[in-house]
Every structure is written in C-alpha cells, then in structure tokens.
Amino acid sequence: MSTDVETGHYSQSSQVENGAACIPDAISFSESKSSGARFAIMLSAIIIGVTAGTLFNTQMSPALTGMFLALTLVGGFLSTWSPCGYSSLSLLRPAGKYSLGSVARWTPTFITHAIGYAIGAVMLGGALGLVGAFLFEQLAFSHMVIGLAALSIAYGAHQLGFLRMPYPQRRAQVPHDARFRFRSSTIGLLYGYALGMNYLTYVQTPILYIVTGAALLSADVTTAITIIAIFNIGRCLPVAVNFLPVSNQSVQAWLAKWQERAVELDGFLLLSIGAAALTMLTL
C-alpha cells in the first residue's frame, strides 16, 4: 500500500490473505485543481468567512457554536476518504447477495460498529476533558477561539497546498485479517472502537485537530465527550450506505471520484469558519 495522506491520495494493491482477495481501497482518483484554482478557493473561503462573521457578529456565541458543530460533523464525514474509511465500507458489508434477509443479518454489525465509535468517544473525549480541566480551566473563551481559529486557517491553507503544517497520526489501518478470526459483529465493534479513538489509524482531515483542541480546551469531560461523539457520528454514518442495494465497486468508485473535492471542501470549511470566528472577535 502507498499513501500520501496529507494531500488525500491513496492507493492499495490487491493482496491475498488465507485465499481471499482483499478489495483495493481505490483504483483511481479525480485530479487536483491547478494552483490558481486552489488559490481562488482559498480566497473565496476567506471572503465568505469574513462576510459571515460580519453578519453574525451580534450573535457571536450561537453563531460560533453552530459553525463549530457543523464543522465537527462534516469533519467526521470527510474522514470517510481515508484508507480506513474505504476499508470499513468495503469490509463491513452484508454477506452474500443483497436481500432483506442479508441486511437484517448484517444489522447487528452496524449496531456494534456504532457502539465501538461511542466507546471511542467516551475514552478519547473523557481523557481530553480531564486533561483540559487540569490545565486550561482558567483559559479565557476569546483566547481559545483565537487559537483554534488561527489553527483552522493554517490547516485550511495546508489542505489547499499553500502551507506546510504538522500532521500527527499513526500510519496504520484497521486490521483486515480480523475478518478471518472474528464474527462480523465483533469486527464491527473492533473497527468502530479503533476509528472512534481517531488517532489509532490514519488521520484524513485536520478538522480532527481542531475538534481535539476544542475538546481539550473545553476543560469539561461532558463537553469533550459530546464534541468527539459528534465527530464520530459523522465517521460512522457513511457505513449505513450498506443498508442500500449498492455494490461495493460503485461505492468505492464514487469515493474515488470525489476524493480531491473532499480535500478541497475540507480546506474551504477550515478557512471560512476560521476567518468568520476571527472576524466576530475583532469587530
């Protein structure tokens, strides 16, 4: 497998394990836009963010909360375009030909997968909340917003290729061989937990770093768990596509088609919301 996580490119060759072929994560991806087009995206994101910040300046608190919650949920969804996102959609599927019966038999797998995400949210969010309560309880709200907004803008520029930012992650996938050793529902739980912890596998979107920072700086265990849980809901929901009569090939092809656009959306959201937050604080 070869990967360039920071630019959103992935490829994985087919392998054979215990006589069963592993489905590649993707075959081909859409092409990146030119630097001029990416600069236009960056500029438009900043302009839209500044405009939104100006318009909602008198309602700063609810506006910031709404924008952050939207960013968190969408960030979880954008994590689908990672090696583990591809793998979960292709490996956690109903067995055999699609039918109401196969979907019913697969439903416990989806449920345990969601439970795994919930456990991950409690563990990661709880840890961040505890550390935050010890270190950042006295941090001013405005300072927190300024720090997260600046980080958001920096990573937005990173996603569009105009700035190099640190990208901490564990370069690992969920274990593919687990499907040869455990029943489907157990695999769903293991995958959900590994992905729900968010830092045990590849990090696709730097929105995760903003979400992590917000959970940490909230200095409250309940708030931190809620923040991570919202992100994990976005990560978990795409697997529900397997309730529909769609082939694995069509899902993988759709993901590959929109791979680069997902990275651009990532950068656009980070830039626009970061710019909006800074604008509201300065007016």
Predicted features and spans:
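Alpha-helical multi-pass membrane helix bundles of inner-membrane/thylakoid proteins
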Residues: T3-V5, Y10-S34, L55-F68, G101-V103, ...
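Functional transmembrane helices that embed catalytic/metal-coordinating motifs
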Residues: F68-L100, I111-A121, S184-S218, T222-P245
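Hydrophobic core of alpha-helical transmembrane segments in multi-pass integral membrane proteins
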Residues: A37-F56, L271-L278
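Helix-coil boundary and interhelical linker segments in multi-pass alpha-helical membrane proteins
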Residues: Q59-L69, L130-V145, G213-T226, L281-L283
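Residue-level signature of transmembrane alpha-helical entry/exit and packing/kink sites
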Residues: R38, M42, L64-T72, R105, ...
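Hydrophobic cores of alpha-helical transmembrane segments in multi-pass inner/ER membrane proteins
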Residues: V74-S90, G147-R164, G234, P238-N242, ...
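Final/C-terminal transmembrane alpha-helix of multipass membrane proteins
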Residues: E260-L283
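Membrane-interface helix-loop-helix junctions at boundaries between adjacent transmembrane segments
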Residues: T65, V74, P94-I119, M123, ...
